[in-house]
């Protein structure tokens, strides 16, 4: 009862997410509503047995699928995705479908009842199908026995043929055949094709029986059996693809074998078992049994008929008879049909789209592959004429790019057949240039470009020289002329040019842009400058200024300045950005002119960053560095023989260099010569080991790498980002070098990622970097095995003090990529000079790939494994491509280095000679300085941290902490020092840099300056870890003994988690030891560790207090610290806070267990045992339960028989909170008494005894650092614990059934709590925990108005307390009420009703004077609420004005119709408001030009010039073009209210009518060309009756439109049309009887009174914001109303009319404020203000 039946349809709806996922795998999309419609209403009408609840029967699904895929008008293409998904669910069922699917048959089961198979397939052209021949009445000849032959028979197979049933004797066979001939006509058996395999003697048989050997007929007509040979089966198996790879090819093979070899039933099983897998064979047998047809020619499900036609077990067919052979022929036919049906793959159009033409593949071959894909992955036949269009489009789009582009440009492409396209493609394919021709063409183009470039360079040089001479001549001439003009007192201007005079050569007949003497061609590259800048100073083509020059970074961009000590101010020539209002007069050699100043710019100087304002002089030849900036630079200019030099105050060169913060330490490194000079013996002895002499490396022992992709990955193609010409030229040499080395090769790949040019700091060189982020997302992740640099040096013993450091050059390029993985890393590159335009990819492991470091590190480890084995006395450390070799002596180091270089050269790796450090006692490795078994921080690292300025932003602070954190091993207590800095790095935290942060910042810097040398870990010696803890921070130092001293190995520090930070000091020490032991393990590598601390924590770890530690944490600590093989505890020591090392003096150790016992609970005498002489024995309980969907709660304190206290708690109170409230109330009521209190709540009991103290020490935070629940109740309980004189809190089991006092009291408390919860709920429970001290109100100031109102209300004045009292409460004056309610509203922004409800629920100790009126005023004057809250104003409907006759008043609008065919996407609609007549024009654009064109060419000639046009505020109507046309023609164009479609209601409704009609017509006709169907839609709209019962056609012409019924036999009555006079009379009647009444009716509507809106001129209103964004107010304003109509407003600041429904009133200012008039500087203007000035 009550259970529902699960059906296939309901099952799919319950797992709809899985259904959509399966549909997505089939490359289709399904919707739930259509899924239900097709299953329950559509497919049952196909009459193929589909139930309304759905089915997973493959046979029924196949029949529905055949109906859906039926070609022509009877098909259902919209149902294809749904039936394909049904088939996928049944074919490969998910777990929730398998119980509803019939299990697949075992290998050879008894034949089950199979569902009906698919529709009949057309017969294949195969000899398996017997020909229909006329029956022969004559008796067939008797089969002859094989004559005895003396020749030996060839034994092809060792095993005997399969046994068959005993055959009847010849006479019996004769009799049977005669009987058969009399009953039915039997056709003679056709001779079977024999195999040329020799002959074989039949085995001996009984005289009465014989063993038949079908199916080869001998010379005497005897059938013989010739089984398959092993070689045949082997060749067929290995020389053909599997059935899953290419089912069509294997089906064709089996078909040919069935035709030529005529196999028996056993042979067929042997053939299927050899060529197919078990699952494939079962699928073929199932499909074959589906194809069995009954007597009616349709697929049958009758088991007897299916088993008779296609048995699964060996049948007893007699192949010597006609009936037996017919059975076998039918079996082969069904087997072939099963192969064909099973070979069909699920529909997957993506597979078809993936077939593309190869580079050298002919179009014919490509077409065959495309057709085969159609046959395999779609249900469509590519040979079907109806599919020729689809195949043709696929052939064009998927052809090679050059062929596809030319085919797309063929004329009259729609009329081309597939054969025509193939012929055109063959012509294009055969006309392709050969590789030799292409190379010759590229070579010629390169030579021509080089020749053209040389000529342009020569011309440019000549022009540059000529321009310099001309400028100098002009300058000298200007000076002379200027002096002469000064003497003459006049000014001479440059003569004006004539209209046809050239400004360049001054000749007439052409202009400067067409001047033949003006140099042409592209500008050459800018000359390279040797400045440490990130970019050149000027624009493209600008020359750098002459010496002395300097480059500074201005506003983030580098600018090269000419040092000009004669210039007072610095000058910028271009890209100034915003300019200020200031200007200055500049006097130069050519005269004076006024120029403007720029706003302040950030300028990076050598002395720091300054703010400076420049003069913007566009016509200045170069940017000038004047005396103002030279002063800020403190520059010094020296004149030497080589020229002027500009240096800083200390003599250093001035330069700007930008680089990453992590590389800044390299600036401070002292430059030195490379350790390996290029001419040294190391280079000559090992030429193959160095990149400088051995070239690009190649790891010869490493196989090409195959990059596996994720299972769901698909190729990603991202276009190349735009790249500047400078960057392209910068990376071009690198690309060319990699191409020459074979590391890059051209390719064609569906993958593509962009290439980024990255400029190297300090140079103009670029390097290519590929953005492989998208590829990294699609590649399988592998576990990274790169060594950790944190503990890598732990494997370096201090005894090895001779080092060699090698850095492998281009390390990743040493590993090859497999050809199948190379397309993943393709990118675009175009170089016309080299003839490259396409994609390039890497043949080696690329940089930027996420797995490159791990793959290379593992490969190099494998290659160097033999070296480590052969040299056990050497230490070889490897971090990716950085190698460190350590030895005990110089000789061993040199010998090992030679062996390592020889090994690297033989393996194919190359080291950088410039970075090599060979056989030295002091080297730099991974940023450390290694010397004498110790590691130091390099001075460069220290200088980097010390040189960073004080952080101003969280990002700068994170950069500082990251840089300093690298050095934390050298800084004792780093975590405690940096504690004030870390909170400022969190997102959303205000960056407030105070004294604490500055102190921490300076302490870290100071500690870094005094950083000691740390010893390298010696894994042969034990380690000692000294641990201390202070205020939640663990600090320690890891040491090893060196003689009598302890040498530090690392300083460790870490902050404890919030839980451990709240423990007592002894337990915090346990947590600190555990944390630092874990970190020290990274350096000790599991070696013995002795822990020394000022606490005896070993006893605590062995017997930890369970009330402080959880079981999981206790187990973790014990497993780590009680491992005696690795961790041991030393004696208790006192540590020096500065060094964390032990102090010489001894202190008496304390007892940690005793201290923990003292800090165990909250109250020392609190116990859980009953007090014998208690004053009270109470029972507490809290109850919380659901009733009618609402959670009720209550709490009670009782004795065994009576209720002491009971209260209902607010709805939603939890049971735990109720228990705390009950216990707290009991403690309060027993103040000063002895109390035994029982509670059945473990939560309340544990909080009082244990957890409360833990929470208090932890700061009331959880283990995750969040605030605990029931915080206020816990605090109240902890405070109430100290109220009773003596206290015992006892836990008792809940819901006891005994008769003890404890059970009775517990039941009483539980019943009282439930009864209290059912009563009226208290408004708040804060009264239970708040202080009982009465609240004294402050001194109130009452105004005269307040006093008058108080006397009216009958309030009394309290003389002693100094305030008025009403209703027993102090009265709060009006001003105080306003301040309180205004603050409350600003916090909550509640409505007046909600604020009243809130104040009524909270029991306020005051009586608020004029509360309701103040609430209303506060909410109405709130600006935030006015801008956000919705408006409830209701505006009555207005009346639209209509024309008084046809053609005078039109409404016009654009509407978009998608999809747009042939470029038509819009519909311009005109509606006559009088008659409703509609004119619509399809357009390609929505512009004012289109509107004007249709108005003048269509509306005006047919209907006359309109008097009024109405439209919305669209750009096509509100533009100046449309309005100007209307003004010229005298048309009154009325723009309706913005965002108010009802204002244009008639044309908007017509838009909807036309689009709905077009939609119906497209569905009915099956075409998408809505332009073709538009006349039918207009005809419908023009002949639809309006509100007055007349159609627009009848209103215009006075009669219905003429209709002709072409099926009427009497057409004569329709041939005579009315005369012209009759038409004129009808129009006159229409004008009198229709037009005038309609005009009168429209006028009556206008005369009806309309309720106007309440807004008046001068009111302030808020205007609705129609396009709001997130967190943006709904209303804008307020605005002042300027004009009004009955339905719309015009406001100040908005040009369009606004409908009254889109505004709401704004609160007017107080009446006391008045407008004031003020004078302004302009005598024609005055200023109006209101309010305080």
Curated annotation (Swiss-Prot):
Composition bias of kind Pro residues appears in 108-121
Q: Which Gene3D superfamilies match?
A: 1.10.340.70, 2.30.30.850, 3.10.20.370, 3.30.70.270, Acid Proteases (2.40.70.10), Gamma-retroviral matrix domain (1.10.150.180), HIV Type 1 Reverse Transcriptase, subunit A, domain 1 (3.10.10.10), Human Immunodeficiency Virus Type 1 Capsid Protein (1.10.375.10)
Disordered: annotated span: 108-218, 449-469, 511-550
Q: Where is this motif: PTAP/PSAP motif?
A: 109-112
List of residues binding Mg(2+) 2: 1181, 1310
User: Which annotated residues bind DNA?
Assistant: 941, 955, 958, 966, 1063, 1113, 1187, 1214, 1216
Enzyme Commission number(s): 3.4.23.-, 2.7.7.49, 2.7.7.7, 3.1.26.4
Q: Which UniProt keywords apply?
A: Aspartyl protease, Capsid protein, Coiled coil, DNA integration, DNA recombination, DNA-binding, DNA-directed DNA polymerase, Endonuclease, Host cell membrane, Host membrane, Hydrolase, Lipoprotein, Magnesium, Manganese, Membrane, Metal-binding, Multifunctional enzyme, Myristate, Nuclease, Nucleotidyltransferase, Phosphoprotein, Protease, RNA suppression of termination, RNA-binding, RNA-directed DNA polymerase, Transferase, Ubl conjugation, Viral genome integration, Viral matrix protein, Viral nucleoprotein, Virion, Virus entry into host cell, Zinc, Zinc-finger
User: Start and end of every RNase H type-1 domain?
Assistant: 1172-1318
Kindly give the InterPro entries that the UniProt entry links to this protein.
Aspartic_peptidase_AS, DNA/RNA_pol_sf, G_retro_matrix, G_retro_matrix_sf, Gag-pol_Znf-H3C2, Gag_p12, Gag_P30, Integrase_cat-core
Tell me which residues are marked as the site Cleavage. 129-130, 213-214, 476-477, 532-533, 657-658, 1328-1329
Q: Does the keyword Repressor apply?
A: no
Q: What would be an example GO MF term here? A: RNA binding
Show the active-site residues.
564 (protease)
Query: What cystine linkages occur within this chain?
Result: none
In what residue span(s) does the Integrase catalytic domain sit?
A: 1442-1600
Write out the biased-composition intervals (Low complexity): 526-535
Name the chain's protein: Gag-Pol polyprotein
Which organism does this record belong to? Xenotropic MuLV-related virus (isolate VP62)
């Amino acid at each position: 009862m009550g259970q529902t039946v699960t059906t296939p349809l309901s099952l799919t709806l319950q797992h709809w997410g899985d259904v959509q996922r399966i549909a997505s795998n089939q490359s289709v999309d399904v919707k739930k509503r259509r899924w239900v419609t097709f299953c329950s209403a559509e497919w049952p009408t196909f009459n193929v047995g589909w139930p309304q609840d759905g089915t997973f029967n493959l046979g029924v699904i196949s029949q529905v699928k055949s109906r859906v895929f039926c070609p022509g008008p009877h098909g259902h293409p919209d149902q294809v995705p749904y039936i394909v998904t049904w088939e996928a669910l049944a074919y490969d069922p998910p777990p929730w479908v398998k119980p509803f699917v019939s299990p697949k048959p075992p290998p050879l089961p008894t034949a089950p009842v199979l569902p009906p198979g698919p529709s009949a397939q057309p017969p294949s052209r195969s000899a398996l199908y017997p020909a229909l021949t006329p029956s022969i009445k004559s008796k067939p000849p008797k089969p002859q026995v094989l004559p005895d032959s003396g020749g030996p028979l060839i034994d092809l197979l060792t095993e005997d043929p399969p046994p068959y049933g005993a055959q009847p004797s010849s006479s019996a066979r004769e009799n049977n055949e005669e009987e058969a001939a009399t009953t039915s006509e039997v056709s003679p058996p056709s001779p079977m094709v024999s195999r040329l395999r020799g002959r074989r003697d039949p085995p001996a048989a009984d005289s009465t029986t014989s063993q038949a050997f079908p199916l080869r007929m001998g010379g005497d007509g005897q059938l013989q059996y010739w089984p398959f040979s092993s070689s045949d089966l082997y060749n067929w198996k290995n020389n053909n693809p599997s059935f899953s790879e290419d089912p069509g090819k294997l089906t064709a093979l089996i078909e040919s074998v069935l035709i030529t070899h005529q196999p028996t039933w056993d042979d067929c099983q042997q053939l299927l078992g050899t060529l197919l897998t078990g699952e494939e064979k079962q699928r073929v047998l199932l499909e074959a049994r589906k194809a069995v047809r009954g007597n009616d020619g349709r697929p049958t499900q009758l088991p007897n008929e299916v088993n008779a036609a296609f048995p699964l077990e060996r049948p007893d067919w007699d192949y010597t008879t006609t009936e037996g052979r017919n059975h076998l022929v039918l079996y082969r036919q069904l087997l072939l049909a099963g192969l064909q049906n099973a070979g069909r793959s699920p529909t997957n159009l993506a597979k078809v789209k993936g077939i593309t033409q190869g580079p050298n593949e002919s179009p014919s071959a490509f077409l065959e592959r495309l057709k085969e894909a159609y046959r395999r992955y779609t249900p469509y036949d590519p040979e079907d004429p109806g599919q020729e269009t689809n195949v043709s489009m696929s052939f064009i789009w998927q052809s090679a790019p050059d062929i596809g582009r030319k085919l797309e440009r063929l004329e009259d492409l729609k009329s081309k057949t597939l054969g025509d396209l193939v012929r055109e493609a063959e012509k294009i394919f055969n006309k392709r240039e050969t590789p030799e021709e292409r190379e010759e063409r590229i070579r010629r183009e390169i030579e021509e470009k080089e020749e053209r470039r040389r000529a342009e360079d020569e011309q440019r040089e000549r022009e540059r020289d000529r321009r310099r001479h001309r400028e100098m001549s002009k300058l000298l001439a200007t000076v002379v002329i200027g002096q002469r003009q000064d003497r003459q007192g006049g000014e001479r201007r440059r003569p004006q040019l004539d209209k046809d005079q050239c400004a360049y050569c001054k000749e007439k007949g052409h202009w400067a842009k067409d001047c033949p003497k003006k140099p042409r061609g592209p500008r050459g590259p800018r000359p390279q400058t040797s400045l440490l800048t990130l970019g050149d100073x000027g624009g493209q083509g600008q020359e750098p200024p002459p010496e002395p020059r300097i480059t500074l970074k201005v506003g983030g961009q580098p600018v090269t300045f000419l040092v000009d000590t004669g210039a007072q101010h610095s000058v910028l020539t271009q890209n100034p950005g915003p300019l200020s209002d200031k200007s200055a007069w500049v006097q130069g050699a050519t005269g004076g002119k006024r120029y403007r100043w720029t706003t302040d710019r950030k300028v990076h100087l050598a002395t720091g960053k300054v703010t400076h304002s420049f003069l913007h002089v566009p016509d200045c030849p170069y940017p000038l560095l004047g005396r103002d900036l030279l002063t800020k630079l403190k520059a010094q200019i020296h004149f030497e023989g080589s020229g002027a030099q500009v240096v800083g105050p200390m003599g250093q060169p001035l330069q700007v260099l930008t680089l990453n913060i992590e590389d800044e330490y390299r600036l401070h490194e002292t430059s030195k010569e490379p350790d390996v000079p290029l001419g040294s013996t190391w280079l000559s002895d090992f030429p193959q080991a160095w990149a400088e002499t051995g070239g690009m490396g190649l790891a010869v022992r490493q196989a090409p790498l195959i990059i596996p992709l994720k299972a769901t990955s698909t190729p990603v193609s991202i276009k190349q980002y735009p790249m500047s010409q400078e960057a392209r030229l910068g990376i071009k040499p690198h690309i060319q070098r990699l191409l020459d080395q074979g590391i890059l090769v051209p390719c064609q790949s569906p993958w593509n990622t962009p290439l980024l040019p990255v400029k190297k700091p300090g140079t103009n060189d670029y390097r290519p970097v590929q953005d492989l982020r998208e590829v990294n997302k699609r590649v399988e992740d592998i576990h990274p095995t790169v060594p950790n640099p944190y503990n890598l040096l732990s494997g370096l013993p201090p005894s090895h003090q001779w080092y060699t450091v090698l850095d492998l050059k281009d390390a990743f390029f040493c590993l090859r990529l497999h050809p199948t993985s190379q397309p993943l890393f393709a990118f675009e590159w175009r170089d016309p000079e080299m003839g490259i335009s396409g994609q390039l990819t890497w043949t080696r492991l690329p940089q930027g790939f996420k797995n490159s470091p791990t793959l290379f590190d593992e490969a190099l480890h494998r290659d160097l494994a033999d070296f480590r084995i052969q040299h056990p006395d050497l230490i070889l450390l490897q971090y990716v491509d950085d190698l460190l070799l350590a030895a005990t002596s110089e000789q061993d180091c040199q010998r090992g280095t030679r062996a390592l270089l020889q090994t690297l050269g033989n393996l194919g790796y190359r080291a950088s000679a410039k970075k090599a450090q060979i056989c030295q006692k002091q080297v730099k490795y991974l940023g450390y300085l290694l010397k004498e078994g110790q590691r130091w921080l390099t001075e460069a690292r220290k200088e980097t941290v010390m040189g960073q300025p004080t952080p101003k932003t969280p990002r700068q602070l994170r950069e500082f902490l990251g840089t300093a954190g690298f050095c934390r091993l050298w800084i004792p207590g780093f975590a405690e020092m940096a504690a004030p800095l870390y909170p400022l790095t969190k997102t959303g935290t205000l960056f407030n840099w105070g004294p604490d942060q500055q102190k921490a910042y300076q302490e870290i810097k100071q500690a870094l300056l005094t950083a000691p040398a740390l010893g390298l870990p010696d894994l042969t010696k034990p380690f000692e870890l000294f641990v201390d803890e202070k205020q939640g921070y663990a600090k320690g130092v890891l040491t090893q003994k060196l003689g009598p001293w302890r040498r530090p190995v690392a300083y460790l520090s870490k902050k404890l988690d919030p839980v451990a930070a709240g423990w007592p000091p002894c337990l915090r020490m346990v947590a600190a030891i555990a944390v630092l032991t874990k970190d020290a393990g990274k350096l000790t590598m599991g070696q013995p560790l002795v822990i020394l601390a000022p606490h005896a924590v070993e006893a605590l770890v062995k017997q930890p207090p369970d009330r402080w530690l959880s079981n999981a944490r206790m187990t973790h600590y014990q497993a780590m610290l009680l491992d005696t093989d690795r961790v041991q505890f030393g004696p208790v020591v006192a540590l020096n806070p500065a060094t964390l090392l032990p102090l010489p003096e001894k202190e008496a150790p304390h007892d940690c267990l005793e201290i923990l016992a003292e800090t165990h609970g909250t109250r020392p005498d609190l116990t859980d045992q009953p007090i014998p002489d208690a004053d009270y024995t109470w029972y507490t309980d809290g109850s919380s339960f659901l009733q009618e969907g609402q959670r009720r709660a209550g709490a009670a304190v009782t004795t065994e028989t009576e209720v002491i206290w009971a209260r209902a708690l607010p709805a939603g109170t939890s049971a735990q909170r109720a228990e705390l409230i009950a216990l707290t109330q009991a403690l309060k009521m027993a103040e000063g008494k002895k109390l035994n209190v029982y509670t059945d709540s473990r939560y309340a009991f544990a909080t009082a005894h244990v957890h409360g103290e833990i929470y208090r020490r932890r700061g009331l935070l959880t283990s995750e650092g969040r605030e605990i629940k029931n915080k206020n109740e816990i605090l109240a309980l902890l405070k109430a614990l100290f109220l009773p004189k003596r206290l015992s809190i006892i836990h008792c089991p809940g819901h006891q059934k005994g008769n003890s006092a404890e059970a009775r009291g517990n039941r009483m408390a539980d019943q009282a709590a439930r009864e209290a919860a059912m009563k009226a709920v208290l408004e708040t429970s804060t009264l239970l925990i708040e202080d009982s001290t009465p609240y004294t109100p402050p001194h109130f100031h009452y105004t005269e108005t307040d006093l008058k109102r108080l006397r009216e209300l009958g309030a009394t004045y309290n003389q002693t307390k100094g305030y008025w009292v009403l209703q027993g409460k102090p009265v709060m004056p009006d001003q105080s009420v306003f301040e309180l309610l205004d603050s409350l509203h600003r916090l909550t922004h509640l409505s007046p009703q909600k604020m009243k409800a809130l104040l009524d629920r909270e029991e306020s100790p005051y009586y608020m004077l004029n509360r309701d009126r103040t609430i209303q005023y506060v909410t109405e004057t709130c600006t935030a609420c006015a801008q956000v809250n919705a408006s409830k104003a209701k505006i009555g409907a207005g009346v639209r004005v209509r024309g008084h006759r046809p053609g005078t008043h039109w409404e016009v609008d654009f509407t978009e119709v998608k999809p747009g065919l042939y470029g038509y996407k819009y519909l311009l609609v005109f509606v006559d408001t009088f008659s409703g007549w509609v004119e619509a024009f399809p357009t390609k654009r929505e512009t004012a030009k289109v509107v004007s064109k249709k108005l003048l060419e269509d509306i005006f000639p047919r209907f006359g010039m309109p008097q009024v046009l109405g439209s919305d505020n669209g750009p096509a109507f509100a533009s100046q073009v449309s309005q100007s046309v209307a003004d010229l023609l005298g048309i009154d164009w009325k723009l309706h209210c913005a965002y108010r479609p009802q204002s244009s209601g008639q044309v908007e409704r017509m838009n909807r009518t036309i689009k709905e009609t077009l939609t119906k017509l497209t569905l009915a006709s099956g075409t998408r060309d809505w332009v073709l169907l538009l006349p039918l839609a207009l005809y419908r709209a023009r002949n639809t009756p309006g509100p007055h019962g007349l159609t627009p056609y009848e209103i215009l012409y006075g009669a219905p439109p003429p209709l002709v019924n072409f099926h009427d036999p009497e057409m004569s009555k329709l041939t005579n049309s009315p005369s012209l006079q009759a038409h004129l009379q009808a129009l006159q009647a229409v004008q009198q009887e229709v037009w005038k009444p309609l005009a009168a009716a429209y006028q009556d509507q206008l005369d009806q009174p309309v309720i106007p809106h309440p807004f008046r001129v001068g009111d302030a209103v808020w205007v609705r914001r129609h396009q709001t964004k997130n967190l943006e107010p709904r209303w804008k304003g307020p605005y002042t109303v300027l004009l009004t109509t009955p339905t719309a407003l015009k406001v100040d600041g908005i040009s369009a009319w606004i409908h009254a429904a889109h505004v709401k009133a704004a609160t007017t200012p107080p009446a006391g404020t008045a407008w004031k008039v003020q004078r302004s500087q302009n005598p024609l203007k005055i200023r109006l203000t209101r309010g305080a000035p």
